[in-house]
Regions:
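Positively charged n-region of N-terminal signal peptides that target proteins for export
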Residues: 1-5
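Exposed beta-sheet edge and beta->alpha loop/turn motif
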Residues: 93-148
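Short solvent-exposed beta->alpha transition segments
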Residues: 50-95
Length: 148
């Protein structure tokens, strides 16, 4: 009897967990991650601005032109030496905006943090802005010892 109850609990837990994967927020996150990965590739010299800018807000489409992209690439190359291995480490959700924070490796700095801010209108997410800053990521050690 205990095994049946345990099995039933496990099945229901997995079923409830899968509901989160089908939420509308996951569609927005997929859009945002697609845009961020395309922007990252663009900064690394891969892709075309015209294709990537479809996920931008109208203001960013106007201001982030080829000259601004070249300036950003130059700044990344000079200050960071290039970026790689970016991983999403934080997602902040607000009423009408999302902020995605990525941490990755840089050649001339210990690490780089990229922050992307999206405005959310219904089921559409538009990139409002982004920034890159060099950061130092410190590993936190767990000093707790097992107590007998």
């Amino acid at each position: 009897m205990k095994k049946i109850i345990l099995m039933l609990t496990a099945v229901l837990s997995l079923g409830m967990a899968s509901l989160g994967f089908a939420s509308p927020a996951s569609d927005l996150l997929a859009q945002e991650e697609t845009t961020t990965s395309n922007v990252i590739k663009l900064i690394q010299g891969k892709g075309q601005l015209a294709e990537v800018s479809t996920g931008f807000s109208p203001a960013l489409q106007k201001n982030f032109n080829a000259a601004a992209l070249d300036n950003m690439k130059k700044g990344v190359t000079e200050q960071l030496g290039g970026i790689s291995n970016l991983k999403l480490v934080r997602l902040d959700k607000f009423a009408d905006a999302d902020r995605l924070v990525y941490i990755g490796d840089a050649k001339k700095a210990p690490n780089v943090q990229m922050t992307f801010v999206f405005s959310v209108k219904g089921k559409k997410a538009e990139l409002q802005g982004l920034n890159l800053i060099p950061v130092e990521v410190k590993q936190v050690q767990n000093n707790q010892k097992a107590q007998a």
